[in-house]
A protein has these predicted regions:
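A structural signal for isolated positions on well-ordered beta-strands in alpha/beta enzyme cores
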Residues: 42-44, 128, 157
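Short beta-strand/turn micro-motifs composed of small residues
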Residues: 17, 47, 131, 160-161
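NAD(P)-dependent aldehyde/semialdehyde dehydrogenase
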Residues: 153-186
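Short, hinge-like loop/turn segments at secondary-structure boundaries
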Residues: 61-65, 90-92, 174-176
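Short acidic, glycine/serine/threonine-rich loops at helix termini
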Residues: 26-28, 54-60, 84-87, 107-111, ...
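Conserved small-residue-rich beta-alpha loop and adjacent elements
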Residues: 1-58, 62
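Short, conserved catalytic or adaptor-binding loops enriched in Gly and charged residues
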Residues: 63-66, 119-121, 179-186
């Protein structure tokens, strides 16, 4: 008798690439490449039309092509999750859905769980940084902004015993937020 385990990839995966405030080609890569490396036969992608383009953002399309997405649909939100979970005349049902999204996408993924596999039910981005007086305030500010720029509902929290660090981090946040195209959100 031999005891062990075998990794058997699902046949097809649906990825969801949001198109809210800015294009996310890295999301297409981060979702598709692991699936392809694992041996998934078919990757189906859904992404809404990007503002001003009327279709999936060109940078996202290029990333999907490079990563090896097999089918791309210009649809988003809860309806894209439902299409991949249950299938339509156009979109075939997938075995598993992965990818981030807003609260409606998260709720849709929660509701289809059981009919199809999902990666997780993600909420708004959040980060908690615990730092003492030895922390670099510039890097600490960047760590906080890296999450808070995603969404107005994102939360970035610093816990420190150093009043100087707290003041310096706040100053760097104000500086960097002023330079970011997403600074108002952050």
């Amino acid at each position: 008798m031999t005891l062990g385990h075998r990794l058997i990839p699902v046949q097809n995966v649906g990825i969801y690439v949001p198109a809210g405030r800015y294009p996310l080609p890295s999301t297409a890569l981060m979702l598709t490449i692991p699936a392809k490396v694992a041996g998934v036969e078919k990757v189906v992608a859904c992404s809404p039309a990007f503002k001003g383009f009327g279709t999936v953002h060109p940078a996202v399309l290029v990333a999907m092509d490079i990563a090896g997405v097999d089918e791309i649909y210009c649809t988003g939100g809860a309806q894209a999750i439902a299409a991949m979970a249950f299938g339509t005349e156009t979109v075939k049902k997938v075995d598993l859905i992965a990818g981030p999204g807003n609260r409606f996408v998260a709720e849709a993924k929660r509701q289809v769980l059981g009919s199809v596999g999902i990666d997780s039910i993600a909420g708004p981005s959040e980060v908690l940084v615990i730092a003492d007086e030895m922390a670099n305030p510039k890097y600490t500010a960047i760590d906080l902004l890296a999450q808070s720029e995603h969404d107005p509902n994102a939360r970035a929290t610093l816990i420190t015993t150093s009043e100087k660090l707290a003041a310096d981090v706040l100053a760097w946040i104000k500086t960097y937020a002023g330079e970011l195209s997403t600074g108002e959100t952050a």
